[in-house]
Amino acid sequence: GIDTPEGVAVLETFKHGILQNSFFISLYIPDRSLSFLRDFDAGNQALYPLLDALVAWLVKVHDQGVYHQDLNVGNILYRELPSSGFSFQLIDNNRMKFYSELSLKMRLKNLRRISDNVDLLNYILKRYAELLHLDTNKVQLQGCFYLMAFEAKQYAKRKLKHCLLKPIPQ
């Protein structure tokens, strides 16, 4: 299975029928967030063992049919193990879907949200492709395309929301 903190509650707030905030409340665990990877520096060689372990874990998550609808470095916790290596846990679990199998397209669309840091995303996509014995260039290109399409959609949604919530002059 996939490790997750034990859930206690889910809290969602809506405004005009639109989800504003969503909170997953779990028991405390001492693991740390991977959110520091948003500032990923490809020259920091010390991060590569963690990244390689993360990618192997992401392959395992996808192999088990888990599709986290908000898969990003802020929703993954990690712990360095004394015997060397790392363990990972997913949080924000109310945003998960489960399938019998994930296609490559679903996997790459899921990975597009892992980070908007292109260097980090490209490294993750490259290692992911290598572990699945796929063409790394093709996987990186598809993954970056899905990221750009996702960001364009998010931008359009923000602009539309801004227009809809803006008061109409009388």
Region locations from a protein language model:
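Conserved ATP-binding subdomain of kinase catalytic cores across diverse folds
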Residues: G1-L34, A53-Q64, H68, K161, ...
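Proline- and acidic/polar-enriched loop/turn elements at helix boundaries
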Residues: A9-V10, V73, S83, L141
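Conserved short alpha-helix within the protein kinase catalytic core
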Residues: N44, Y48-V55
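C-lobe/activation-segment region of protein kinase-like
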Residues: F86-L165
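Activation-loop N-terminal segment of eukaryotic-like protein kinases
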Residues: Y78-G85
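Hydrophobic residue at the +6 position relative to the catalytic HRD Asp in the kinase catalytic loop
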Residues: L71-Y78
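AlphaC helix of the protein kinase catalytic domain
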Residues: L34-G43
